[in-house]
Amino acid sequence: MSQNLKKKNKSYKETLHTLNIKEDSEKQITLLTEKIKSLQKHFLENKNDLHSRRGLLKKVSRRRKILNYLKRKNKMRYFDLIKKLNLRN
């Protein structure tokens, strides 16, 4: 396993542990948020990378769909997760 992948897995597990996340949909949202943040850093250096931009938009769309599902199923967990991940103002 590459060093970069080990580092990403470690940061993901630490995030799950510190935020006390146990449900699958919340884990998926957290993982997508981590990937979106790393892609945002990538775009600061590579503004014209349109292929990666499409991947970013797909990840944002996927996260939005899972968030909508979570909001429908359990509003309290939805609002807690939004607060923990600082997704809304």
Swiss-Prot record:
GO biological process, alphabetically ordered: translation
SUPFAM superfamilies linked: S15/NS1 RNA-binding domain
GO molecular-function terms, A-Z: rRNA binding; structural constituent of ribosome
InterPro entries: Ribosomal_uS15 (IPR000589), Ribosomal_uS15_bac-type (IPR005290), uS15_NS1_RNA-bd_sf (IPR009068)
Gene3D superfamilies reported for this sequence: S15/NS1, RNA-binding
Pfam family, one: Ribosomal_S15
Record key words, sorted: Ribonucleoprotein, Ribosomal protein, RNA-binding, rRNA-binding
GO cellular component: a single term: cytosolic small ribosomal subunit
Role summary: One of the primary rRNA binding proteins, it binds directly to 16S rRNA where it helps nucleate assembly of the platform of the 30S subunit by binding and bridging several RNA helices of the 16S rRNA.
NCBIfam families: S15_bact
Assembly and interaction partners: Part of the 30S ribosomal subunit. Forms a bridge to the 50S subunit in the 70S ribosome, contacting the 23S rRNA.
Family: Belongs to the universal ribosomal protein uS15 family.
Protein name stated in the entry: Small ribosomal subunit protein uS15
Species per Swiss-Prot/TrEMBL record: Wigglesworthia glossinidia brevipalpis
